[in-house]
């Protein structure tokens, strides 16, 4: 699974390549076409192979995930661009994209789940082949809005934004190092490798990213790290057979992986609609305060099941209580917590570098998740939980959830006060920050001098912003002239 998930850690590298090297004059269209062809080829091999080894399957899933993460990244870059140029900071685009993602997940759970449970795998692979080819037609018809670029390599963009490109390269190398530590090392080595990579990347980000981008990026990393994942132990607790855990829920895999996922996908859609209708206009800090307390509330359901309060104290059977908590409440809260991160990430993307910037920001969030899971594995071992041989032991799991999923997330609150903007989520943050979130990521020394001479008065700040925009436009013209000269 580590090898299969490796491409998601290298998204920043592919974002840099697509932003700086147009393919056929486009930075997204033909990259997505090639990714769809690659994914269909992987599905075709899986569908037609009579027998396949574990290593071959891991390699194929790695290629498949590479294709999926390229499509995912480039679409994220495109809707980040549309939010800046057309959306005026509104959440409609993000909500629509994730509505489609959630609907697709719901459809996949309904169709693929029951078939996979019955061992019907190859027909699913043939279906995946067809689905992988479907996006190619609208792309070739030009339905993805994108202007054709001049030149085969945007060397001016590379020179002007070498800091973020360097960060993207280091991030990809760090992801590879963590994958190797996971494959060949212990839980300790994975934890220390991920922590070391995090500190290195945070330091580089502080030096190469604009202050606003760097501080918001650090906050999103802290959000992921603050809720230490004990999901591995919880999954064993839920599905452990009676022979290994006498007083457990004893869920079947069909219920746990299929039907709970179907219910969860439906209520995830409900969470998306609640965010769009009620929360998308909230203050950035306040919405993260709210989501922090909601995540803490969701952890109560897991503690209640682990401590058996639902059956012994409340008289609610395990299946009903699990559906109420993990399949209804948790998906709603997860979506409400997730969408503000997506909105903030999209708003902070630099013009012309949407894929690179998004991949770097999302990469830090993924890195935070890796640290969270690594720390969770360490905590599970330290608390003496036994999940490898029968009988299983989860005596300290409730305490672990209380500390890791209820106390630790409270650390986010002071970080939100100092690292996040005091603005509404639907405001165009790149304007609210006087250019810092968008324009400043490409400022030259002249522009930085102007930005630093702002006195703080509204009238003079407007003059400063206008001057910065003028110089930035002139610099962009120079870059385009240089690129045309190189092409000639």
Please describe what each predicted stretch is.
Residues 41, 50-52, 56-57, 84-235, ...:
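Intracellular loop-helix junctions on the cytosolic face of multi-pass helical membrane proteins
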Residues 4-12, 68, 88-116, 260-267, ...:
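Glycine-rich segments within core transmembrane alpha-helices of 12-TM secondary carriers
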Residues 25-33, 114-132, 181-193, 283-287, ...:
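A membrane-interface helix-boundary motif in multi-pass transporters
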Residues 68-84, 334-356:
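Intracellular juxtamembrane helix-capping segments at the cytosolic ends
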Residues 80, 84-97, 253-254, 320-321, ...:
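Loop-to-transmembrane helix entry/capping segments in MFS-fold secondary transporters
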Residues 7-14, 195-204, 256-282, 290-303, ...:
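Transmembrane alpha-helices of Major Facilitator/SLC transporters
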Residues 75, 79, 229-238, 242-246, ...:
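Hydrophobic/aromatic end-of-helix segments at the C-terminal termini of transmembrane alpha-helices
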Residues 33-52, 293-316:
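C-terminal ends and interior cores of transmembrane alpha-helices
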């Amino acid at each position: 699974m580590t090898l299969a998930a490796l491409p998601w850690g290298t998204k920043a590298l592919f974002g840099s390549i697509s932003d700086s090297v147009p393919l056929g004059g486009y930075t997204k269209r033909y990259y997505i076409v090639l990714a769809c062809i690659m994914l269909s080829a992987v599905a075709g091999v899986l569908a037609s192979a009579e027998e396949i080894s574990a290593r071959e399957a891991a390699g194929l899933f790695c290629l498949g995930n590479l294709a999926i993460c390229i499509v995912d990244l480039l679409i994220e870059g495109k809707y980040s661009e549309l939010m800046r140029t057309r959306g005026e900071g509104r959440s409609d685009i993000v909500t629509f994209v994730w509505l489609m993602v959630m609907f697709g997940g719901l459809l996949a759970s309904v169709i693929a789940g029951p078939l996979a449970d019955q061992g019907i795998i190859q027909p699913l692979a043939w279906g995946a082949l067809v689905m992988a080819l479907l996006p190619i037609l609208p792309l070739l018809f030009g339905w993805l809005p994108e202007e054709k670029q001049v030149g085969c390599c945007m060397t001016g963009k590379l020179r002007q934004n070498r800091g973020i490109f360097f960060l993207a390269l280091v991030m990809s190398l760090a992801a590879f190092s963590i994958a190797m530590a996971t494959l060949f090392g212990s839980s300790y080595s994975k934890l220390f490798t991920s922590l070391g990579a995090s500190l290195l990347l945070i330091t580089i980000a502080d030096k190469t990213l604009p202050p606003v981008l760097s501080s918001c990026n650090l906050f999103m990393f802290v959000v992921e790290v603050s809720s230490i994942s004990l999901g591995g132990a919880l999954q064993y607790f839920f599905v452990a057979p009676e022979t290994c855990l006498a007083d457990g829920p004893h869920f079947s895999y069909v219920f746990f992986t299929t039907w709970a996922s179907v219910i969860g996908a439906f209520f995830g859609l409900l969470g998306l609609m609640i965010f769009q209708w009620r929360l998308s206009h909230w203050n950035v800090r306040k919405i993260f305060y709210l989501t922090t307390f909601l995540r803490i509330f969701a952890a109560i359901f897991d503690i209640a099941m682990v401590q058996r309060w639902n059956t012994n104290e409340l008289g609610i059977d395990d299946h009903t209580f699990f559906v109420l908590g993990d399949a209804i409440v948790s998906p709603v809260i997860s979506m409400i917590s997730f969408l503000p991160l997506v909105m903030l990430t999209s708003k902070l993307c630099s013009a012309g570098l949407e894929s690179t910037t998004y991949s770097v920001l999302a990469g830090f969030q993924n890195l935070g998740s890796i640290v969270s899971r690594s720390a969770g594995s360490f905590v599970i071992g330290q608390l003496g939980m036994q999940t490898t041989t029968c009988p299983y032991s989860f005596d300290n799991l409730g305490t672990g959830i209380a500390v890791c999923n209820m106390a630790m997330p409270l650390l986010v609150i002071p970080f939100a006060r100092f690292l996040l903007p005091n603005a509404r989520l639907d405001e165009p943050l790149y304007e609210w920050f006087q250019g810092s979130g968008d324009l400043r990521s490409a400022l030259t020394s002249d522009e930085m001098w102007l930005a630093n001479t702002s006195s703080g008065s509204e009238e003079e700040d407007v003059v400063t912003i206008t001057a910065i925009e003028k110089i930035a436009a002139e610099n962009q013209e120079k870059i385009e002239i240089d690129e045309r000269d190189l092409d000639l």
